[in-house]
């Protein structure tokens, strides 16, 4: 085994269908369900996930103001928290503090129990909202993981490990890609283009989300319209249209119109459309406190909403991004991952993350929906998403931001 080993961390988020949970896990959840509902452990870590999400977003936004952004803070945070189980010393502290946890105010056990509850909640079968997540380790067939690490990642993060022949990089690449393709039901293929020769361990984390609008758009109302990427660039996009009652709020602090659109189930998409020329102001000013207040403001108004069909993805090597958040030691020669294995010193070389967002008109009409007549439709004000905007997809049971993004150009893949 080489003395210095590169560790590949692959994080995925995409649309998929929810798979059934294991019987053992279901039985465990049933026994603890009452306690979880009264005081969910995931609620204690939710504010920290939200702070981490906005910190990560700002770093990505500073890197480029001309490209779409889309990532899953829950996916990234759960993978890093799981990895922290095998770290020690400053390496350990940096990861958890980089995720916005103060170890003098919250016990580490509470952090991991929060993620355990979060993952259990997200993976509960739901006939309305299709949502699932998971973690798996691919390890060099000659590398022995410590029993304590394996036990912890299994019990807290529902993760397992697959022996992998990393000496044959092509074989290992195909094994990982095959797992990802099967797990995403073909949504993501050939994710890993190549593996470094010294890679001996890879963590694949995924979160899949597919929601149907509580109040859908009508496919018959879709038409091509302009989307203004910037002052000099305009693209044509399929623009969806619906008139109805929406939770809409103008936030003076953010200089933005805020639209909330519910999914069937327990998730809401929050769209923030800044005034012209105010995107930078929105990005600098938005906070977890403001988002919390916006989520509570559910007063509805009549609006004609125009919204582009969106199919975007974000692919990132987050090493530099995480380093800017203070997570540096795990990428260095002095990284301490001795809680993972004692066979050889490990170093994280890459943190790869891919997230995919598809938004279209699909949905199922909810009972008791409001229908407006032609006269009311003409009187309703217009809210048109025809310029860059932000999106946060929020899951209510866990109070967590599943996805965060910025749509700069809906035609940009």
Curated annotation (Swiss-Prot):
Top-level division of the source organism's lineage: Eukaryota
InterPro entries: Serpin_CS, Serpin_dom, Serpin_fam, Serpin_sf, Serpin_sf_1, Serpin_sf_2
Marked site (Reactive bond) residue numbers: 377-378
Main location per the UniProt record: secreted
This protein's GO CC annotations: extracellular space
Compartments reported by the entry: Secreted
PTM characteristics: The N-terminus is blocked.
Descriptive protein name: Hibernation-specific plasma protein HP-55
The organism of origin for this protein: Tamias sibiricus (Siberian chipmunk)
